[in-house]
C-alpha cells in the first residue's frame, strides 16, 4: 500500500480534468484550497455561469483522523477504533443546455490503520451519466468508454461494475434510476494494491474521453423554456439522490468534511412539482420509456 503514490495521482488527475474542461468552456474554474481542522484538506475547483457549464465542481480532498464516523463503521464494524486516511477526486458537471447530460465521476482510496494490525484499505469509484433528453449514441459512447477503462484489468469487470452502478444510483423512494448509469465499484482490494490502483487510475484517466465528445455534440443544440423546465424538474431527482441515498455525501457530512465542497454537486436551478408526469409519447416521456431502464447499451454499438 502506497498512500503518497495515490495522492500524487489524484492531484494530477484533478489538474488534467480542470484544464480539459476549461478548454471546452472557455471560462476558468475558481480554485479554492481549504483545510480541515481535524486533519487534512483539499482543493475545490468550481465553475458557475460558464459558457457551457451552468455549474460544475472538481474536488480533491485528503482527510485523516483518529476515528471513523458512524456511516463508515455501520457496514464494517472491524473498522471501529482505527485511525483513517481517505483521498479522492469527485466531480459533478451540470451543463446549461438541457440536451447535454449531467455527469458524475469519482475515484477514491481509503485506509484504516491500527498499531500491530495489518492496514485495511480499498479503492472505490466510477462514473455515470444523467441525461434529460437522451440520445442512444451518447449512451453507447459513454458505456464504451467505461468498458475501455476496465478492459485492461479483465473482461469480468465491466458487466459487474455496470450492474453495481445501476443498483447504486437508484432512487428507491421513486422506483427509478437516476440516469443511464455507467460503472461503480467500492471496497476493491483484491488481488493486490497495484492491480486495484491501475484499475482505478484507468477509470479516472478515461473520464474526459467519455464525456467531452458528448458535451461538444450537445452544447449548442437549440432549446426553449419547455426543455429548461423539464431539466429543472429532473434535476430535482439528482438532489434527492445526493441528499437521501449517497454514501459519499453522508460520509463527508458526518466526518466533518467541508460542506461547500460536498454540496457543490447540487444543480443551481431545480424545480419540484406535485404528482407530475410527462404526456405519453412526448420527448420528455421518452426519457422514462427508453433511457431510465437499466438496459445494456453496448450491443447497440
Curated annotation (Swiss-Prot):
InterPro entries for this protein: Coprogen_oxidase_aer, Coprogen_oxidase_aer_sf, Coprogen_oxidase_CS
- According to the record, the residues making up region (Important for dimerization) are 238-273
Cofactors: a divalent metal cation
* Site positions per UniProt: Important for dimerization: 173
Biological processes, Gene Ontology terms? protoporphyrinogen IX biosynthetic process
Amino acids binding a divalent metal cation: 94, 104, 143, 173
| Class of the enzyme per the UniProt entry, highest EC level | oxidoreductase
* Pathway linked to the protein: Porphyrin-containing compound metabolism; protoporphyrin-IX biosynthesis; protoporphyrinogen-IX from coproporphyrinogen-III (O2 route): step 1/1
Alphabetical UniProt keywords = Cytoplasm, Heme biosynthesis, Metal-binding, Oxidoreductase, Porphyrin biosynthesis
Q: Quaternary state and partners of this protein?
A: Homodimer.
Name of the protein in question: Oxygen-dependent coproporphyrinogen-III oxidase
